Structures are given as structure tokens and as C-alpha cells.
Amino acid sequence: SEINGDWNTIALSAD
């Protein structure tokens, strides 16, 4: 996956 794409998923989970 794109780094940004993975970060977005992590951010949503963290939030």
C-alpha cells in the first residue's frame, strides 16, 4: 500500500 494510505487507516483507528 501507499505509505499515506496506510497512515490514513491508522489515523482513523487511533481517532
Curated annotation (Swiss-Prot):
Q: Which organism is it from?
A: Cavia porcellus (Guinea pig)
Q: Which UniProt keywords apply?
A: Allergen, Pheromone-binding, Secreted, Transport
Instruction: Indicate yes or no for the key word Zinc.
Output: no
Q: Which family does it belong to?
A: Belongs to the calycin superfamily. Lipocalin family.
Function per UniProt: Binds pheromones that are released from drying urine of males. These pheromones affect the sexual behavior of females.
Task: State what protein this is by name.
Answer: Major urinary protein
Give the signal sequence positions.
none
The protein's predominant localisation is secreted
